[in-house]
């Protein structure tokens, strides 16, 4: 509900007070953002990438005449913070896509050249191509995941 309220609010025009380039306070008007979307990333109750969760989120979007399309985050709570489980999330989403569902407009994944992550204790000992934040899939797993998704989209078409 909070995400849907945020999408609805962002679509509307808003006014705000801010300094201009010369430092004078000015009232600005936005035109609104027609591209707001939900990102399912899991939460305190666990993952929410499964077909039931995706369909429920899209039903809520439909109740407010919003496009029934969303983004699925393969990482964070959807993989229980175990980066290799992103491939399991990808397999599930691929099955949803192959079944003809059109709800998933995009995905997010934690990916880098080298798998895993590293602490930033000593910047001189950092390994090139490896994350210093969240653990990531490596290049090979990323290409496998993207190929799986491409094949799923082709199978749906």
Predicted regions: what they are:
Residues 1-49, 53, 76-77, 81, ...:
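Active-site-facing alpha/beta catalytic cores
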Residues 36-37, 68-70:
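Conserved active-site beta-strand-loop modules that form the wall/rim of enzyme catalytic pockets
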Residues 59-63:
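Catalytic-site microenvironment of enzymes
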Residues 72, 138:
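Conserved, mostly hydrophobic/aromatic
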Residues 118-136:
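Acidic, Ser/Thr-rich peripheral helices and adjacent loops at domain boundaries
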Residues 148:
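Nucleotide/phosphate-binding sheet-loop regions of phosphoryl- and nucleotidyl-transfer enzymes
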Residues 151-157:
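Generic C-terminal helix-cap and adjacent flexible tail
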């Amino acid at each position: 509900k909070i995400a849907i309220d945020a999408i609805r609010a962002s679509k509307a025009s808003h006014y705000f007070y801010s300094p201009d380039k010369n430092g004078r306070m000015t009232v600005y008007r936005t035109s609104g953002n027609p591209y707001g979307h939900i990102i399912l990333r899991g939460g305190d109750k666990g993952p929410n990438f499964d077909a039931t969760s995706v369909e429920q989120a899209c039903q809520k979007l439909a109740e407010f005449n919003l496009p029934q399309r969303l983004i699925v985050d393969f990482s964070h709570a959807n993989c229980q913070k175990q980066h290799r489980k992103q491939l399991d999330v990808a397999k599930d989403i691929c099955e949803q896509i192959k079944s003809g569902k059109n709800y998933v407009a995009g995905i997010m994944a934690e990916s880098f050249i080298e798998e895993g992550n590293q602490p930033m204790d000593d910047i001189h000992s950092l390994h090139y191509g490896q994350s210093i934040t969240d653990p990531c899939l490596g290049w090979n797993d990323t290409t496998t995941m993207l190929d799986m998704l491409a094949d799923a989209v082709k199978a749906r078409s």
